[in-house]
Regions:
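Ligand-binding beta-strand-loop-alpha-helix segment within the catalytic cores
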Residues: 169-191, 195-198
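A generic structural signal for well-ordered coil/turn residues at beta-strand boundaries
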Residues: 71, 164, 173-175
Length: 294
């Protein structure tokens, strides 16, 4: 069977993406797993290989995916002419040009996936400030009228026409999905609503089943210290989270505890194998434990 073709976005050319990509694809072992092709600008990738001291690597310019060689020692780049003058482009600086480049790479790799030209996508880092400056600068002309995205998740949802979605992070058997992500902590608390919590529980259940987990064991983290202590430290668990859990249970979804699990203990249990996935209420509640572990 042919190995899957993986489209890898270059990321913001002022950031770490091009450098990380060169280092990763310089390892021949990657080609035993998949057939990688970078979506980006050849000029940026040529500069990146010099920056990391891998001038032995050949950057192979492709106009279409079928041009790729998929050969160790050669990095295939589906060329998008994104940076006008690479000699004047500043590394580690937020810019409209860099933000637009990063966005166009994501948009293109989604297009390739939707067309079946790549089997999976992998995204390097983009700078949200730079990207949104670019979207606003061009008044949506280079982004189909859109002038703001919070991040990769929202771009993917928009261009795949997906209405119900959330971010998942995974490291081995630790999986996390979020009720909200890139919003202020104050707004994140306001977004803890029954309908959204239920929606994310349902997404988590389906995602685990798609990954081959027959009856996913789900934990739902509370929002407040000790899950609010029966309303003493907040009422979201009583008014929003528990009602969502009750509906999910009635739908046959396996919420192990049948109630919110205290945020300060849910991940010790998850790492101990109690759950297949944890539904968290906001960005850092899920990102911190997963990034510490992974």
């Amino acid at each position: 069977m042919n190995k899957p073709i993986v489209g890898i976005t270059m990321g913001d050319p002022a950031g770490s993406g091009p450098e990380i990509t060169i280092k990763a694809l310089a390892d021949p072992e990657q080609y035993s797993y998949c057939r990688p092709i970078v979506v980006g600008d050849v000029k940026v990738m040529e500069q990146a290989k010099k920056f990391v001291g891998r001038e032995d690597i050949v950057i192979h310019r492709c106009e279409k995916v079928s041009d790729a060689l998929f050969t160790p020692g050669t990095i295939d780049v589906l060329h998008l002419d994104l940076i006008e003058d690479i000699s004047k482009f500043e590394i580690a600086k937020v810019s409209v040009e860099g933000g637009n480049a990063a966005f166009q790479c994501v948009k293109k790799v989604i297009e390739l996936a939707m067309a079946g030209e790549v089997d999976a996508t992998c995204t390097n880092a983009l700078n949200k400030e730079a990207m949104n400056k670019a979207l606003e600068y061009y008044h949506g002309e280079k982004s189909d009228g859109y002038t703001h995205f919070d991040g990769h998740t929202e771009i993917y949802a928009t261009y795949t026409h997906t209405k119900k979605y959330t971010m998942m992070l995974a490291h081995h058997d630790l999986r996390v999905v979020h009720v909200s992500t890139h919003v202020s902590l104050r707004e994140a608390c306001d977004r803890v609503k029954k309908d959204r919590v239920l929606e994310v529980i349902e997404i988590a259940n389906k995602a685990c089943k798609d990954m081959g987990i027959e009856n996913p064991r789900i934990a739902v983290a509370g929002l407040n210290p000790h899950c609010g202590e029966n309303g003493m430290f907040g009422t979201e668990e009583i008014e929003e989270i528990q009602p969502a859990i009750d509906i999910a249970l009635a739908e046959g979804i396996n919420i192990v505890e049948k109630k919110p699990t205290p945020p300060d203990t849910v991940f010790s249990k998850a790492l101990g194998g109690w759950y297949d996935i944890v539904v968290v209420m906001y960005h850092d509640q899920g990102h911190i434990p997963l990034k510490v572990e992974g």
